Curated annotation (Swiss-Prot):
It comes from the Bacteria. GO terms for molecular function: [isocitrate dehydrogenase (NADP+)] kinase activity; AMP binding; ATP binding; magnesium ion binding; manganese ion binding; phosphoprotein phosphatase activity; protein serine/threonine kinase activity; protein serine/threonine phosphatase activity. It comes from Escherichia coli (strain K12). GO terms for cellular component: cytoplasm. The active site is at residue 371. It is found in: Cytoplasm. InterPro entries: AceK_kinase, AceK_regulatory, Isocitrate_DH_AceK. Belongs to the AceK family. This is Isocitrate dehydrogenase kinase/phosphatase. One of its GO terms (biological process) is tricarboxylic acid cycle. Keywords: ATP-binding, Cytoplasm, Glyoxylate bypass, Hydrolase, Kinase, Nucleotide-binding, Protein phosphatase, Serine/threonine-protein kinase, Transferase, Tricarboxylic acid cycle.
Length: 578
């Protein structure tokens, strides 16, 4: 290779990332217009398009590099020099951290995810931790109650870029003040002030004002979801001021926000204070930088592994028929490998399973489906693997494993947030906790269905419980669109003997689902059955599901709330007039 080519390649990769992030910001900047036009289908399509941008631009850069090198192979020394040149381009680059991830992605695409060593990749960042450039303008603006909180909130709302009319601005302001007074007390509220992000956070059918409520005793989140009435008028649906509520809003089971962030590292740092339980990976994920979030997630895994004496074990719960799931006992993630062969009743291919996981990545997860990161050629030290798990891996996924002596390489796996399997949770709880879990499960099914997702296998073992008590779906191999399912009533038996027969007395075609049958496996436990019948009996009726299908086919997009119905102002305070 001619000398000087290394710098050209490094510059080409960085220019490719510039193009990718420019398009990322372009799609993001259209969020306000889509919201104001109430074009919810465009919102969903923009979300998918933005997810695809990264891989598309990686592919473009790879083709450019193959042209530059005339398809010639490159030796290790050449690649190291390319990385050295690339590193020298980063000290004055504003998005250095994601640029490093982009370099990694290009390298992996060029070399088929092989030879992934720290010398060749940015396994850890080359730049000082939390290094920032001069920010062209502040990320947030401070508002002080010099003339009272009503005046302060009027200024906050008047500062918003939204061009639609407000349904009743005074009412919403008084709702917020009432909530803040109940939360802080009059005296503390008088001594508090707000810091509000300059950019709105758009997701689904809401525009979120994200801020910090700075009180004498500390800083709290200040989140206002702004919605539209059917007449296109704006209203504030609630005010959230706890870290637990904020954590759910920015949760791993939700779609990524669209927030204009030319300097994502600075925004992530600003968010840390109100989301103390979120890792760096989770914060990048929340603002849509999902590929860099994957890098940060891998770094978090490596740091944990270096500091623990644990071995990987099979994850607790009922063993799956499609996926082999393992974890580190103290780590908050699970690792999922597609088995070489599935149980006989699972008539599907590995390609189908991967397509289901990609569907979830691109779809609106409505807070009810866990996000995943996909890895290829994942290296594990044998000393970190328990003997029982090693035996299981070789038994169930040998075709995906390469033995390197002291290491194994798993050709493909997913990493996902670890949760308590719902079936285990239900065995351990009683009283109100049991009731809450059943309510959550039914709500999860309803919200998934309203978002055009049918889980397929609705057994409790396929759902998990988060640390906030939310029920989230995580087994995707039978997932499909609601509109692909034929929901049927079971025909009445022709003769009394029909009900005793081993075979059904009616025909069953692929895609047929009989909701009446759900009762058999969801209500078998006498502690659970009465609760289910009380709260979710309509899930056992085919007409309920068909009505949802009709709404979806008519183009209706349901509202998705990242908080309980009882937290909505309209429920808490009613239509109070001001």
């Amino acid at each position: 290779m001619p000398r000087g080519l290394e710098l050209l390649i490094a510059q080409t990769i960085l220019q490719g990332f510039d193009a990718q992030y420019g398009r990322f910001l372009e799609v993001t900047s259209g969020a306000q217009q889509r919201f104001e036009q109430a074009d919810w289908h465009a919102v969903q399509q923009a979300m998918k398009n933005r997810i695809h941008l990264y891989d598309h631009h990686v592919g473009l850069v790879v083709e450019q590099l193959r042209c530059i090198t005339n398809g010639q192979s490159t030796d290790a020394a050449f690649l190291l020099r390319v990385k050295e040149h690339y590193t020298r381009l980063l000290p004055d680059y504003p998005r250095f951290e994601i640029a490093e991830s982009f370099f990694n992605s290009v390298y992996c695409r060029l070399f088929d995810h092989r030879s992934l060593t720290p010398e060749r990749l940015f396994i850890f960042s080359s730049q000082p931790e939390r290094r920032f450039r001069t920010i062209p303008r502040p990320l947030a603006k401070d508002f002080h109650p010099d003339h009272g909180w009503e005046s302060l909130l009027m200024r906050v709302i008047s500062d918003l870029p939204l061009r639609l009319r407000w349904q009743n601005k005074s009412r919403d302001i008084h709702y917020i003040i009432r909530h803040l007074t109940e939360t802080l007390g009059t005296d503390n509220l008088a001594e508090s002030h707000l810091q509000v992000a300059n950019e709105l956070f758009y997701r689904n059918k809401a525009a979120w004002l994200v801020g910090k409520l700075i009180t004498p005793s500390g800083t709290l989140p200040f989140l206002l979801p702004i919605h539209q009435t059917d007449d296109g008028e704006l209203f504030i649906d609630t005010c959230l001021t706890t870290t637990a509520e904020a954590s759910i809003v920015f949760g791993f089971a939700r779609s990524y926000f669209m927030v204009y962030a030319p300097l994502p590292a600075a925004l992530v740092e600003w968010l840390r204070e109100i989301l103390p339980g979120k890792t760096t990976a989770e914060l990048y994920m929340a603002i849509g930088c999902q590929k860099h979030a994957k890098t940060e997630s891998y770094r978090e895994y490596l740091v944990y592994l270096q500091g623990c004496n644990e071995q990987f074990i099979e994850a607790p719960g009922i063993r799956g028929m499609v996926m082999l799931v393992f974890t580190l006992p103290g780590f908050d993630r699970v690792f999922k490998v597609i088995k070489d062969r599935f149980a006989p009743q699972k008539e599907m291919s590995a390609a189908h399973v991967r397509a289901c996981y990609q569907l979830v990545k691109e779809h609106d997860r409505v807070g009810r489906m866990a996000d995943t990161q996909e890895f290829e050629n994942f290296v594990l030290e044998k000393r970190h693997i328990s003997p029982a798990l090693m035996e299981l891996l070789l038994q169930e996924a040998a075709e995906k494993i390469t033995d390197l002596g002291e290491q194994i390489v798993i050709r493909h796996l997913y990493i996902e947030r670890r949760m308590v399997p719902l079936n285990i949770w239900l065995e351990q709880v009683e009283g109100q906790q049991l009731r809450d879990a059943i309510e959550e499960y039914g709500n999860a099914i309803r919200q998934l269905a309203a978002a055009n997702i049918f889980p397929g296998d609705m057994l409790f073992k396929n759902f998990g419980v988060t640390r906030h008590g939310r029920v989230v779906f995580y087994d995707y191999d039978e997932i499909c669109y609601m509109t692909e399912v034929n929901f049927r009533d079971i025909p009445p038996p022709r003769y009394p003997e029909d009900e005793l027969a081993s075979e059904p007395w009616y025909s069953v075609s692929p895609g047929d689902v009989f909701p009446e049958e759900f009762r058999h496996w969801l209500c078998a436990d006498p502690r659970i059955g009465p609760l289910f019948e009380e709260m979710h009996a309509d899930l056992f009726r085919a007409d309920y599901w068909r009505a949802l299908q009709n709404r979806i086919r008519e183009g209706h997009v349901e509202d998705v709330y990242a908080y309980r119905r009882r937290q909505r102002f309209s429920v808490r305070y009613g239509e109070m007039l001001f």
